[in-house]
Amino acid sequence: MVGYLVLVLNVRLNEKVCRMFNPYNVDLSQENIDVIQKNNTILLSYGIACHFDKPYHRECRGHIWHYDGISWKRFSRPYDKFWNLHESKCVLKLEEEYVLINGNKSSYEDIYLTPKEDGTCIQLYYDYEIGKWIPNTLGTLHVSNIFNVGITFQELFWKLSKEKYGISESLINETFNKDNTYLFEICADVNRIVTRYSTDRIYFVTSRNISDGHYLTSNEFSNEKPLLMTYHQITRFKVNNKNELMKLLKQYENDNDDKKFPEGFVVCANNGECIAKIKNEKYILYHGVLSGDPVFKRKQIVRLFFQNGLDDIPPEFFNEQDEAFVQRLKTYVNSLILEIEQKIQEKESKVFNTRKDYALWVTANIPSQVNGYFFQGCQGSFKDWLKERVEKNIDTYIYL
């Protein structure tokens, strides 16, 4: 191992090397941890197949490390991974009068809720290698455009900070504590997901000490406090039991003048650690339509169509191409239903001497993707039959 370390010191780090030579001294490729590398700096990000069976796996959510030629040094410490309430790995369980955190019984007094703003998380950290503060997403070390709109997240952060809050890069450099990572949420029209905000904004969410992971309270800030308080602030809510929590979640589904289609809440322990996400049902529905690539979106539209759920989606979520696809889908399905109803009547008027005669007639007269309905004796509504098989036949619809 010593020989290997000596070899690394004499070569330029790259992602392949860092999968073996990293702060945890393990083969990250075997643990489904991705390494994003830039010069001697790496960002660690869990892969979709990560089992989260090691304590440090939760840290692999955008934490940034730098190798100075002798040892690894943390550059940033954003959130650790936490899950939606319904997911099996979530550490929080809600009971009527108490909560379980990592299996330990706690009071509702030990937690609080904050709105989960529907934007892009930005970690602001000091890069000692280049000597400046860097606002970055949790997923990359490299500057990239926001959905190909011609502006990067770094540019958007500095632009909104200066124009909306009067906070310049030089002012941050003079006042912010380099021992901390500052976490923000950018919510703007150019990076909009589901929630519609009345104005572009940056929320200051929290700050974390890089060395020990401590979440700072407002009383622990120094010169940077006035600037942090200038950004949009996250509201905290306290509840006494599960019933109050669910009522709050239900109330938060409603739109207001400042925010439409809110996402839900983050549940935090009183020490500031995020332990669960609870999302509104409406948001989950809308997110399924809006997120993902065009093929995924079409699949969601098809599912909603057969569930009679398209009317529940606000019209502003559909562009012209989506609306045209919905019309083609309706036309195709309605035409198919009419055709099959006519074929059912035709079948009833015929006499088939053998099962083979019937099978030959079905094969010759019924579209292959739905002939199973006839081979099953045309039992029940044809539309219900289609609905039950929408997943199996979904490719038939999405390319209309």
Q: Could you say what each language-model-derived stretch is?
A:
Residues 4-400:
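Core nucleotide-handling region used for phosphoryl-transfer chemistry
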